[in-house]
Amino acid sequence: MKLIYVFLLILAVRLASVFVVQTYYVPDEYWQSLEVAHKLTFGYGYLTWEWVQGIRSYVYPLLIAGLYKILALLQLDSAHLLVVLPRIVQALLSAYSDYRFFVWTGKRKWALFLILVPWFWFYTGSRTLANTLEASLTTIALSYFPWYGESTAYLWPAAICCFLRPTAAVIWLPLSLYHLRRSRQNVLELILKRFVLIGLLVAGLGIAIDTYWHGQLIVTPYEFLKYNIFNNIGSFYGSHPWHWYFSVGLPTVLGINTLPFIFGVMETVKKSEKYPVSKQLLITIFLTLVVLSAVEHKEFRFVSPLLPLCLYVITDALSRWSIRASSTMLWTTALVILVGNVMPAWYLSTVHQKGPIELMPKLREIAREYRDEREHQANILFLMPCHSTPYYSHIHQNVTMRFLTCEPNLEKKEQYKDEADRFFEDPVHWINSHIPMHPLTALPTHVVLFDPLAENISVFLRNYRLLHRIEHAEVTRLEGSQALVDQWSEALGAQSPNLASLLQNRQSRTGRSILVYQRLKKGEENAFNRGPDSGQHEPDVHDHPPLEDLVLANENENLFN
């Protein structure tokens, strides 16, 4: 097959993922890229604490901001294009990295098959995540790595990787040592003229960009390591056991490909002289997992740069096995791998956690068209776990919005709880303490929440009508910060009988549906928790006292000031 046809096939799959993948994965896809770019370009948006503290580099958001600026100049900056175009560009980069993987592996058929079918790469390959960019750059760098020559071209994408994601150095340190050990060039000269020079150029440019946009001299890779590694801030968002990457993380990312990967590991260990590249890749994979395992906070996406390394090991082993395997075995193996990847790719890309993505066009319409009695625009309150949805980048209207924040304990206060934790501990108290009642027009015009919360704040919602119910997930999971682990420990240590209710409280943070409520205007019928076609009985307005009669802890505090 001609290389151009190979690239076009890969490109078609990656571009298809842009439009097939319509589910929510992690907040960083929006809050650390699109949201930042939107604020840079259009002057409004939300910057999370990471940008205030300077632990994120502006390099990636600036690339997206460049796209936004072009769209704005052409007067094509519709919300739809602001969402789709960055994903298309990321898909193009992912497609090129996949093509380079095919070339790197010797243009083997198994390589093309294995780079196209992984469920996790289909699921994340077009998302605007720094981890996706890192995985693409890692693959490109590996394809230029001097496995059998003296090229140092790989140092450029590798250096960019390490600047944007300092943890990438864990991958490139053993590979760089391997390069230096095998090189026939003078080692000191190679280090000074290539490694140090390229590193300084990339770091210098990155520091200059970040210093300008952060407004002060700053080295974001150092700040990243200081907060996430040395201060262990990441553990606030969840901790996992040391073996998680080995027992859960990498096997989940590989999915059904774990089976041929194990086969590849066994073949490489038994016949390491036949698999010199796979041997070095396995050493790199193992060392990377060991180092990452030392950090308490772990996520699937953190091992996505290891995916091309694992796929190479699989390709190497299956290509040699294919020489002696029967045609039936070959087709059966390929079919099992294909089906085993298509199923999770389809479910996670189209069904699970689709609510936030389907929600945003509805909020966009509200932001564009809604006006209250005083002709004021919408103001929207998200009573959900923090960053449960995209934000201004998907609405592209400068309306007032508010969500529950979840900054970590940067000041190391005792008994610290973020705003989201405080809200879900006692939603009614939080509402009474933070939302003004007089006049009723001071209430948020719209409230967005997951369905289990509605019953807990039913009195508050009597001033609203149900506008939209959006299906979110067939299966919900526990949400929350490190406080969940702390509460588990306390409950178990005290042999508390309330563990079940404690977990139920956490479970109620998310739900199967997302509900959008709209504030009642004067003279409108009070139809609490009832959709247009729901058929639910309307509660008697005398069952509860009017909300304006409730006593507030802080009546004068305005949520949207």
Swiss-Prot record:
Molecular function (Gene Ontology), one example: alpha-1,2-mannosyltransferase activity
Subcellular location: Endoplasmic reticulum membrane
Transmembrane segments: 3-25, 64-84, 110-130, 155-175, 195-215, 246-266, 275-295, 328-348
UniProt keyword terms in alphabetical order: Endoplasmic reticulum, Glycoprotein, Glycosyltransferase, GPI-anchor biosynthesis, Membrane, Transferase, Transmembrane, Transmembrane helix
Enzyme nomenclature, EC number: 2.4.1.-
Start-end of Basic and acidic residues biased regions: 535-546
Gene Ontology annotations for the cellular component aspect, listed alphabetically: endoplasmic reticulum membrane
Membrane topology recorded in Swiss-Prot or TrEMBL: Multi-pass membrane protein
Region Disordered, annotated ranges: 525-546
Pathway participation: Glycolipid biosynthesis; glycosylphosphatidylinositol-anchor biosynthesis
Any one GO biological process: GPI anchor biosynthetic process
Glycosylation sites: N398, N456
Enzyme class, first EC level, given as a word: transferase
A Pfam family recorded for this sequence: Glyco_transf_22
General function of this protein: Mannosyltransferase involved in glycosylphosphatidylinositol-anchor biosynthesis. Transfers the third alpha-1,2-mannose to Man2-GlcN-acyl-PI during GPI precursor assembly.
Similarity comment text for this entry: Belongs to the glycosyltransferase 22 family. PIGB subfamily.
Protein name per UniProt: GPI mannosyltransferase 3
Originating species: Drosophila melanogaster (Fruit fly)
Lineage, highest ranks first: Eukaryota, Metazoa, Ecdysozoa, Arthropoda, Hexapoda
Name of the gene: PIG-B
